Amino acid sequence: IQYKVKYQDNTPFDDFYLKAFPSMKGYFWYFPLENGYAHIGAGDYERKNNNVFVDEFLKKHKCEVIKKVGRPVRISPPKNSEPFTDGRKTVGVGESIGTVYPLLGEGIIPSTWCAQLFIKHITDFNAYRREVLKKFQIYALVFKFIQMKINGKFNLFKNAVELLKIYNHMKHEEKRYGMEVKFKDLMKVSRI
């Protein structure tokens, strides 16, 4: 669920704000826009906590709700979304084939990367497929991590290499994700 809201006086935050749910199966977000507008919302795997967090935030930070928008976010990676084409006229690009970073639910920038790959390989769908799978390979690993956490099958010792790969990816991409990535924080997520 997501709301577009308008604050008359002060906005709650000058920058974006994310808060993971205690279950680590979803999170609340606040994204400021311009002139007192913002997007606030929440989403979780089980769809249990969305309204609780949003309602608490709306009560604490008074604003006018402009509109309500809600839809599921697909976090299944491209590897799990094949085939990308029907072989005739239709080719999947972006979020339709899973270019959403599963740990954060962010898909706008990855979808533009995917669109660039599509344009680059518009006459060779096999090359497009190969390059998409390579570019978004880490998404499959992150998705597997999330599935193991949800199903209670993650083991820190057995899955340490995978966790380190996820950390290295996020650490290398700190600027892109707009956050400082600390290994201790990823360890907290892995223990929950």
Task: Please name every model-derived segment.
Residues 120-192:
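C-terminal helical "tail/cap" subdomain of flavin- and related membrane-associated enzymes
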Residues 9-18, 37-39, 54, 74-81, ...:
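Low-complexity, flexible helical/coil segments
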Residues 19-23, 47, 65, 74-78, ...:
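A general structural signal for short secondary-structure boundary/capping elements
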Residues 18-36, 79-104, 138-152:
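A broadly tuned preference for mixed-charge, low-complexity surface segments
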Residues 46-120, 124:
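FAD/FMN-dependent oxidoreductases across multiple families
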Residues 1-51:
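Conserved FAD-binding catalytic core of PHBH/FMO-like flavoproteins
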